[in-house]
Amino acid sequence: MSVPTRAPGRPPVPPDHPAVDTLHRFLRIPSPSGEEGPMAAEAVTVMRGLGYRAGTDAAGNAVGVIGSGDGPRLMLLSHIDTVSGQIPVRLSDGRLYGRGAVDAKAPFAAMVHAGAALGPGFPGSITVVGAVEEETPGSKGAVAVRETHRPPDALVVGEPSGWSTVVLGYKGKLDLRYRVTRPPTHPSNPAPKAAELAAECWHTLLDLLGPDSGHGSFGRPGATLVALHGDPAAAEAEFDVRIPPGFDTDALLRALRDRTPYGELTELQAVAAVRTTRRDPVVRALSAAVRAHGGELSQKVKTATSDMNTLAQAWDVPMATYGPGDSRLDHADDEHIEIDEYLKGVSVLTHALRRLATDETLTRSRT
């Protein structure tokens, strides 16, 4: 792949690292959620240049397939949308800066190059997906993949775990909206006001979740007050509840409705938590690859939510999340990735794919 011409004032891209070239190209294309078209087109161009059969699907996802054998069917899925707010793209002191450098264009670019490293001779097939709208409540891209693709034999979801860390699971997510209206009245009237009831609904939710709730523990629910606005006559509040595996969302909604009789509580979205095990073939392959590259392996669960949740709702297949990058820089004003970190991520993914290619448990699961 040729190295793009350097614009005036733009740092040069190292010509000996095609994977860095690819990430640099991706970062130069803004792709906030809902506006991923140019980025998807660039991803297709890059994948075709690396030997993939590639195109965009009806949802706008960039999809590339390489290999055509009868062995394991692997899928690598990351997202190509970002939050809003651009960051000047630059390469400085071994770091590549730009919106999406961590979340999640680096994991996606790493997947593209890892699949290409195994090439058309891969004994099975590798499908790489750059999904749209992961940063939105509906996860449009992952939902479309879930509905239009056969479940793969193994799935790697691309998010910034750090090159030596494998993510085994994520909390689920419950988005709620509470709306209430009350007859207009004087502020001194002791009758409940709409704004007061909305605030009371929030405190009732916290009470129902219990004193140990919070975002610091994978095993406990945690809530965030996303919005609260109104006046004595009309008010609205929105809540984001992160839920652990096995959490009874129906029981929570019943109890909250029972204790907030004046308003209307609406479930906007519900995504269950997901957690795999250390014995999962994908976890084993990624973990072995980290160790083979001299990494101090870490296996974690996260209190956020990702496309792994969305896909696990319908696909009961081996899966884990992995990708280069420091997740503490997600959405940050100085979002960047260390080039060394990124290239290690490419190598780890490549090693893991080779291991999965010979994992007989994957093909046996289809027979």
Predicted segments, located by residue:
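Active-site metal-coordination/substrate-binding segment of hydrolases
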Residues: 46, 71-130, 333
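Pyridoxal 5′-phosphate
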Residues: 19-20, 224
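A non-catalytic alpha/beta surface segment that caps or lines the substrate-entry region
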Residues: 31-71
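Short beta-strand/turn micro-motifs at beta-sheet edges
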Residues: 86-87, 164-168, 224-230
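Metal-dependent amide/peptide-bond hydrolase catalytic core
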Residues: 2-14, 35, 55, 174-367
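Acidic/histidine-rich catalytic neighborhood of metal-dependent amide-processing enzymes
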Residues: 109-175
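Acidic, glycine-rich active-site loops and adjacent beta-strand->loop/helix elements
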Residues: 80, 95, 129-137, 160-162, ...
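Acidic-glycine-rich active-site phosphate/pyrophosphate-binding loop
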Residues: 77-92, 169-177, 288, 320
